[in-house]
Every structure is written in structure tokens, then in C-alpha cells.
């Protein structure tokens, strides 16, 4: 029986035309691809989502390990190749669609992908902005600079802080540009994302916490006492300092996730609701 693709019914790509985003670099090193699949530690019980499947270098290996593979690709030429390569794998579904227009699986799922660099941040937001989703863990190859921003101990960005309240994000190792075709201008990194078993906050608090994070990280280099004084009274700040075991000069961008949980819980317990900072509305892809 001929396998059906789930076609994105939008603008069709002409022969020789590439997708409307740039930054897709295909991996050609078999050992590297095997390492990615091995590090993902997937089993027959897993549903795997691959974002930007390309010509299927990862897809075919994932098909042999996972119970279900959802391979997303927007390039018509690559979709044809993927369909042919996975014809003998009924557990693999090719989704012909723009990555940013898909609906995430409702069940628990794992992400194993070499993602297009140009949409790294939108992809991370899609996966991590809703900690109540089914996303459990992932091994994602991305541009090294982005990987370092997402894993830095000094946190400048409110979204990165919010993600890390519910997910552990770490660099497994760096990857040279020579392992890709066409080779990117910069090196890459293999990033592991894992849902925290004991997150310091309930996922229902995500939006409220993001508002706090945006307010406090307007100036990440600011001292703790300056960054939060618009929310807490002097007496509450004194209580916080004792709870966190820090002084007034502690830089707000260096606080840990557990310390942020204490700050958030103190706010929800002692600060009137109308004084809670609200999360700003952003356009898709902004961070």
C-alpha cells in the first residue's frame, strides 16, 4: 500500500525552489547521526517528532528505534526522498508542512532533530512555552551561539529563565561545521533538553512567572534589590534576602531556578495580585 503524506495546503513550491526559510544544513556524517540517535535513548514506546527531516538521514535510524516517528519537512523534493526511504517503515509518518504551522502531538513525545538555524528560537518557544504539553525530552542540533545563550549560567532572557524552571537544558558537545552540507558559517552544538521530574513550580504558573521574569530581567546586571523593588516592599525584600541567603548586591541574572521559585512563591503569597507584573505580548519568533 502506498504511504500517504500529510500535505501542507499552502503555497506550493516550484521545482528547484527552496522553503521560505533559510538555515537548513543537512548532516552527512553517519557516526554523528548514530551518536545523536543513541544519545536520544529512545525505545519502541516513544513517539518521536523530527523537525526539519531533510533527506532522512536521521529519520531512517529513528524509524528503527521508535514506536512512532513524525517527520516534518517543508521542501517538496526532500519529502519525495523521505517517502521513498521510509516506505518500509509503517511507523513513520511524513508531514509535508512548515515546521511553525504544525500541531504538536497530544501524547507524550520526544524531539530528535537537526533544526533549521534560522528558526531556532521559534522552535524552542513552540516546544517549551507550554510546560503542560506532551514534550518530554529531546536531542536537538542547533547553532552553537544559540545553544550557549540557552544554557548560560548568567540568564539575560526571560523566556530562557522560564523554560529552565521546567526543563533542564545542556550542551552535550560541539559539532564542527564540516559535518554539514552545505556547511554553515558557524559551528553547531548538540543540546539535550529534559523535563524536570521535580520542577520548582507547577506548570499552571508559567504565564505569571514569565511576567515576573520579564520585569526582573529588564536589566540582568542589576542588583537584586534594584531589580525587584517595584514589586516587593522593603520588609518583604528583607524577608526574601534571608530566605535566599543573599545580599542586596546579588546580580539578578545569576539567581538559580530554585531561588526564582522562592521569589515567585513569596510574590504570590504576600504581594497583592494587582501588583504582579504582567507578561508582554510578543510577535511570533520574538524573544
Swiss-Prot record:
GO terms for molecular function: RNA binding; rRNA (adenine-N6,N6-)-dimethyltransferase activity. SMART domains: rADc. Keywords: Antibiotic resistance, Methyltransferase, RNA-binding, S-adenosyl-L-methionine, Transferase. S-adenosyl-L-methionine binds at residues 25, 27, 52, 73, 98, 114. One of its GO terms (biological process) is response to antibiotic. It is an enzyme of class 2 (transferase). Its EC number is 2.1.1.-. It holds the Pfam family RrnaAD. It comes from the Bacteria. PANTHER family: DIMETHYLADENOSINE TRANSFERASE (PTHR11727), DIMETHYLADENOSINE TRANSFERASE-RELATED (PTHR11727:SF7). Involved in erythromycin resistance. Belongs to the class I-like SAM-binding methyltransferase superfamily. rRNA adenine N(6)-methyltransferase family. This is rRNA adenine N-6-methyltransferase.
